């Protein structure tokens, strides 16, 4: 047992490492080599310290870079990386070796520390990829606390290749400890190491211009090499001013969208209570491919029509990074203009951003956030007060006996929403933003407290069956929520959407779409980023079907449906939606061309809309000195 984590006395999940069964000859050979190395006595000529150091550092960088690729990729994928990219990976590793050498002046110790650090980074990526289906990058470092909080619900399994990596690294470390090379004069050695590191960095920088950080599946490792891809993700943390950005460009947009306009559709005499449910991993997998199940998975969701806008929306994430979906909904901004793999809550929110929260607070709403998990997850304990939420409710505010698998149920979350509604003052306008946890991955373990009712017909994927059973449970809880608010007299609007699709067995996707997760067209790829949504009211608002939108537009649709005057930024989004109905981190849907395109391939009016969108988003997020208070009004104190 590696470890366990508890939530009070409720969560009891052990994390197990699989036993790797090596052939006898492998273990015998390892033993012979290991004890042979241990018995060696190696004395190096101190007069040749520079030569020995150069050999040790160079071979250490090469061995570590190739060792990492061997750990992360099978032979077929390893063969895809070009020699030039592999050289860049070796140089990245060498920079680490050189940097450590400056501080140790002991080349053997340098090689030991550098190899362990780099291999540990690759080891983290090894498990992160197993759990969420994409790779660990620099911005994920800020998510470590969140990752550790849910790590106990996953199985940590080492495959045979990982076992060989451990054996080879053990032999390397044992050998390197036999080599004693140190420098009495540290300053000359440090100058040489720093100079070489700078030259390596310059070479890497020159040859990575235009190279993008890959975050889809294992593309980072087999297109760029893992270490290089990680380094590129560091570069992406620095946001450049977009082309065409200026105060004058922002002023032009101010002149177009500086006045609020009333929405003529769906106005109500009293402002409605607005309830948002962002449902964890809630998805309709049939958009990816057809399959059959033994029961109807979401009969209640499917029945919703009256007073409902309903359809599908593009998320910008797959399998993880929930807060990016939350951020797109609340702010109207898009991950399309931010680096791949970034997490906005942990990287870019340092003050009070203009959002649905600030806009509703400015017209008198009490804003409440609910999330039945730890407040530190994705730094929500910092972000929510910055956003201006009046109340926050986290796991300690929920009944922790009401769990399914290891997470608070949707039913318990909805009952908490009802309780807060019933306790509101008679003249209180209420906005509740809730984020569920029930359906969180992984889906491989069996639980005594969960009777899985749904299963696929004709084929057996245990994790898929568990996921589908969870969605079925969510549907029952959703029926409770809607049924309750159907009966209340005051106007209520409920916005419901999934944050992203789940990360399931990689072997499931070829069955579902005939291709799997690789070699997809942009349109096929966007299917994996598609989630269901609806906006329902308990008052007359008509029914509408939306074939496709995106999460950044949903708050604008919600304000329109609620009869609330659109702030300037939402006016812009409403107009843009007419030309570009959906946009996310992967691309956008061009109405004029009738197909998905990458943002950089936009032309004509599409390019104009996207450029103005990027300018406004940059002004809102990064140009604090020149932020437009007309388009992005501050929260009134």
Each model region followed by its residue ranges:
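Solvent-exposed soluble domains appended to multi-pass membrane proteins
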Residues: 258-268, 279, 284-637
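Alpha-helix initiation and N-capping motif
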Residues: 141-144, 224-227, 231, 247, ...
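A diffuse structural propensity rather than consistent per-protein peaks
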Residues: 127, 131-140, 159, 243-247, ...
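Transmembrane and membrane-interface helices of multi-pass
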Residues: 12-221
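Single conserved hydrophobic/aromatic residue that forms the stacking wall/gate
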Residues: 1-14
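Membrane-interface segments at or immediately adjacent to transmembrane helices
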Residues: 204-276
């Amino acid at each position: 047992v590696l470890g366990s984590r508890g939530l009070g006395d409720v969560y009891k999940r052990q994390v197990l490492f699989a036993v790797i069964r090596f052939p006898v000859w492998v273990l015998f050979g390892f033993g012979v080599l290991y004890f042979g190395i241990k018995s060696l006595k190696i004395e190096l000529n101190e007069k040749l310290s520079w030569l020995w150091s150069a050999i040790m550092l160079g071979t250490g960088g090469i061995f570590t870079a190739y060792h990492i690729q061997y750990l992360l990729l099978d032979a077929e994928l390893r063969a895809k990386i070009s020699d030039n990219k592999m050289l860049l990976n070796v140089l990245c590793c060498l920079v680490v070796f050189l940097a450590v050498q400056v501080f140790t002046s002991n080349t053997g110790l340098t090689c030991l520390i550098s190899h362990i650090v780099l291999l540990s980074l690759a080891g983290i990526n090894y498990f992160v990829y197993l759990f969420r289906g994409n790779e660990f990058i620099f911005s994920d470092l800020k998510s470590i606390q969140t990752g550790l909080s849910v790590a106990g619900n996953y199985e940590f399994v080492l495959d045979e290749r990982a076992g060989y990596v451990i054996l080879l690294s053990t032999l390397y470390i044992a050998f390197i400890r036999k080599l004693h090379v140190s420098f009495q004069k540290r300053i000359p050695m440090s100058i040489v190491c720093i100079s070489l590191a700078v030259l390596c960095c310059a070479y890497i920088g020159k040859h990575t211009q235009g190279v993008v950080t890959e975050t889809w599946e294992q593309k980072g490792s087999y297109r760029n090499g893992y270490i290089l891809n990680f380094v590129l993700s560091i570069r992406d943390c620095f946001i450049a001013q977009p082309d065409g950005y200026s105060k004058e460009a922002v002023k032009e947009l101010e002149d177009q969208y500086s006045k609020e306009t009333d929405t003529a559709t769906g106005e109500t005499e009293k402002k409605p209570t607005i309830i948002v449910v962002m449902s964890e991993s809630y998805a309709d997998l049939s958009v990816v491919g057809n399959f059959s199940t033994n029961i109807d998975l979401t009969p209640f969701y499917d029945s919703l029509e009256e007073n409902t806008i309903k359809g599908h929306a593009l998320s910008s994430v797959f399998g993880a990074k929930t807060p990016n979906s939350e951020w797109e909904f609340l702010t109207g901004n898009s991950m399309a203009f931010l680096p791949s793999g970034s997490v906005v809550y942990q990287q870019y929110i340092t003050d009070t951003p203009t959002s649905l929260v600030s806009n509703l607070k400015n017209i008198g709403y009490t804003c409440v956030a609910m999330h039945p998990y730890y407040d530190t997850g994705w730094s929500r304990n910092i972000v929510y007060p910055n956003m201006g939420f009046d109340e926050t409710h986290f796991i300690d505010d929920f009944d922790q006996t009401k769990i399914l698998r290891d997470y608070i149920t949707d039913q318990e979350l909805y009952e908490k929403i009802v309780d807060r509604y019933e306790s509101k003052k008679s003249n209180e306008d209420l906005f509740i933003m809730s984020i569920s946890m029930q359906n969180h991955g992984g889906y491989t373990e069996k639980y005594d407290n969960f009777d899985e009712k749904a299963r696929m017909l004709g084929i057996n994927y245990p994790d898929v069956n568990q996921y589908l059973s969870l969605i079925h449970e969510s549907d029952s809880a959703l029926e409770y929520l809607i049924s309750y608010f159907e009966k209340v007299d005051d106007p209520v609007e409920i916005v419901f959407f999934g944050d992203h699709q789940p990360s399931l067995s990689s072997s499931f996707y070829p069955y579902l779409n005939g291709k799997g997760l690789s070699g997809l067209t942009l349109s096929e790829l966007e299917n994996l980023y598609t989630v269901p949504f609806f906006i329902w009211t308990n008052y007359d608002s008509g029914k509408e079907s939306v074939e496709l939108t995106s999460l950044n537009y949903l708050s604008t649709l919600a304000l329109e449906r609620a009869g609330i005057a659109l702030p300037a930024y939402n006016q812009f989004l409403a107009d843009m939606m007419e030309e570009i109905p959906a946009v996310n981190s992967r691309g956008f849907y061009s109405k004029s061309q009738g197909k998905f395109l990458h943002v950089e391939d936009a032309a004509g009016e599409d390019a104009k809309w996207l450029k103005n969108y990027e300018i406004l988003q940059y002004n809102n997020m990064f140009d604090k000195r020149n932020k437009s208070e007309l388009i992005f009004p501050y929260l009134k104190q």
